[in-house]
Amino acid sequence: MKAGERPKLVRGVRQESRRFRLLVIVVGFFLVSLTFVFVSKPDAILFSLNGKLPVEQAPTSILIQQKVNEPSGESRKTSTDALRGDPKVVDDEADAKPKGTGGGSEEEEGRVLSEPDPTSGMMEPTHNKDGNGHKSHQETLGGGGDGESKGNDEEGEHAEQKHKVTLPTVSNYTIHDAAEDTENAKQEGMNNVQQGSKPLCDFSNFRANVCEMRGDVRIHPTATSVLFMEPEGSQRDEVWKIKPYPRKGDEFCLSHITEVTVKSSKVAPECTKYHDVPAVIFSLTGYTGNLFHDFTDVLVPLFTTASEFNGEVQFLITDMALWWTIKYQTVLQKLSKYPVIDFSKDDQVHCFKHAIVGLHAYMEFTIDSTKAPHNYSMADFNRFMRGAYSLGRDSVTVLGEYPKIKPRLLIIKRHRTRMFLNLDEIISMAEELGFEVVIDEANVSSDISRFARLVNSVDVMMGVHGAGLTNCVFLPQHATLIQIVPWGGLDWISRTDFGNPAELMGLRYKQYSIGVDESSLTDQYPRDHEIFKNPISFHQRGFDFIRQTFMDKQNVKLDCKRFRPILLEALDNLNP
């Protein structure tokens, strides 16, 4: 190597070394910056790389939007009820027997939640046989309480086993929402809803789907279809499937309900009968024939849906139960001035300007006044029932207003299950406090009008948890309902079924939960048994066990000394 070339080589190496160090510094700085971005805001890189929107901006399906936008109150109820997991404890023992006057039959009550039969395991919802051969629960409105009529026990035993069903809880509705939307109330062509127009149907309610149309509506019962006529040029193309009975998500119940197709159309059969009033379409199968469900599934929702029309509305009934319409004809005639149309036997094409398919329903035996048309409430329903049966008392009698008249106490008497074992002692205590005591059984053979008048004549009504308490709808304002809760951790069920509705109707409500010593279960289990230490733990065994143990096999012996303050408080409520 020449002497002059070495210094040049050394300078070249140094320059390359500086470039390399500079490159290392730049790359290092880039890596440090990238690491910082990944750690602090990883989504800024990930979403920009894969082209996806952040979660809060990503579009959601209609079903997801319905769930997300659901009111927080309903969401909370859904989660809590679902965690409970137990069917509501409904009433009662069933003695199904056909009733001649109704052309059908009425089943025993069954309690608000469910009451499967121990022999058959499940009890089916009532459904038509040859039009009106309906099996129903013994506890119906006209006598709601026990589901028992004297002399009918053995005769009804066989029929009872055929028509028992596990009645669903509120949580069932929400748990099965997805199944309902895809199976029992699926809509086709939802994407074809015309932009800017309201869909024909609203499937967002967790308990009931409802369709409502204004315009040229053609109802063709033979085809079980409701057609909404569209003008030429309209882009609307909707098809909905709906079962007009408010037990959304209860697939077993809805399997007995006729499905009605609601669709928009430019072609339809010619009208054969024109109506100047709106139409309301609903079903009478499901759990009708059960006192509590007659109200919570039909009468309360029907009032909520149809009351605004002041009688100028036409009812069309799918799955007709003739005996039911006869039993409740006073209520039906108060809501509609027109004879009901039997969907299954009508071959006309009825044309309306306004039609509603399905009934507005919310929680059990309750109207949500924030969502109901015209903000109807349970107080309005209570007033409506008193008016329908022409009941004389709108409010209780103030103590002292009529010195010779004693406050009246109605005790709902039961047989076979949840009986008062010391009824005479209870009567004596109540009379000692100044009550005039009336004892009655709210059974299937009771005349509704008579029983309504009896309930309306009293100031206080009491009874052990059961469908007979549904008759509180006839009580005057500010009357007191006292519910005796059997042993077994049934407090929340009892309040949900009757306590909350009673208070919403403007009644005073007292709930008395019996102690261990007041339960006949002490005759069946030792006092140190877990059933007394932790009854809630037995709910995990399912409703069959709950019903058989805490409902069917338990009677009540009230501790009159402990119960006395409840009656005294009811008396105080009658003071001005």
Curated annotation (Swiss-Prot):
<feature type="topological domain" description="Lumenal">
    <location>
        <begin position="41"/>
        <end position="576"/>
    </location>
</feature>
<keyword id="KW-0812">Transmembrane</keyword>
<keyword id="KW-0735">Signal-anchor</keyword>
<protein>
    <recommendedName>
        <fullName>Alpha-1,3-arabinosyltransferase XAT3</fullName>
        <ecNumber>2.4.2.-</ecNumber>
    </recommendedName>
</protein>
<dbReference type="GO" id="GO:0009664">
    <property type="term" value="P:plant-type cell wall organization"/>
</dbReference>
<dbReference type="Pfam" id="PF04577">
    <property type="entry name" value="Glyco_transf_61"/>
</dbReference>
<feature type="compositionally biased region" description="Basic and acidic residues">
    <location>
        <begin position="126"/>
        <end position="138"/>
    </location>
</feature>
<comment type="pathway">
    <text>Glycan metabolism.</text>
</comment>
<dbReference type="GO" id="GO:0000139">
    <property type="term" value="C:Golgi membrane"/>
</dbReference>
<feature type="glycosylation site" description="N-linked (GlcNAc...) asparagine">
    <location>
        <position position="443"/>
    </location>
</feature>
<comment type="similarity">
    <text>Belongs to the glycosyltransferase 61 family.</text>
</comment>
<feature type="glycosylation site" description="N-linked (GlcNAc...) asparagine">
    <location>
        <position position="375"/>
    </location>
</feature>
<keyword id="KW-0328">Glycosyltransferase</keyword>
<feature type="compositionally biased region" description="Basic and acidic residues">
    <location>
        <begin position="147"/>
        <end position="163"/>
    </location>
</feature>
<dbReference type="InterPro" id="IPR007657">
    <property type="entry name" value="Glycosyltransferase_61"/>
</dbReference>
<keyword id="KW-0325">Glycoprotein</keyword>
<feature type="region of interest" description="Disordered">
    <location>
        <begin position="64"/>
        <end position="171"/>
    </location>
</feature>
<dbReference type="InterPro" id="IPR049625">
    <property type="entry name" value="Glyco_transf_61_cat"/>
</dbReference>
<dbReference type="GO" id="GO:0052636">
    <property type="term" value="F:arabinosyltransferase activity"/>
</dbReference>
<keyword id="KW-0961">Cell wall biogenesis/degradation</keyword>
<dbReference type="GO" id="GO:0016757">
    <property type="term" value="F:glycosyltransferase activity"/>
</dbReference>
<keyword id="KW-1133">Transmembrane helix</keyword>
<feature type="glycosylation site" description="N-linked (GlcNAc...) asparagine">
    <location>
        <position position="172"/>
    </location>
</feature>
<feature type="compositionally biased region" description="Basic and acidic residues">
    <location>
        <begin position="73"/>
        <end position="98"/>
    </location>
</feature>
<keyword id="KW-0472">Membrane</keyword>
<feature type="transmembrane region" description="Helical; Signal-anchor for type II membrane protein">
    <location>
        <begin position="20"/>
        <end position="40"/>
    </location>
</feature>
<comment type="function">
    <text>Glycosyltransferase involved in the arabinosylation of xylan, the major hemicellulose (non-cellulosic component) of primary and secondary walls of angiosperms. Possesses alpha-1,3-arabinosyltransferase activity, transferring an arabinofuranose residue to the xylan backbone.</text>
</comment>
<keyword id="KW-0333">Golgi apparatus</keyword>
<feature type="topological domain" description="Cytoplasmic">
    <location>
        <begin position="1"/>
        <end position="19"/>
    </location>
</feature>
<keyword id="KW-0808">Transferase</keyword>
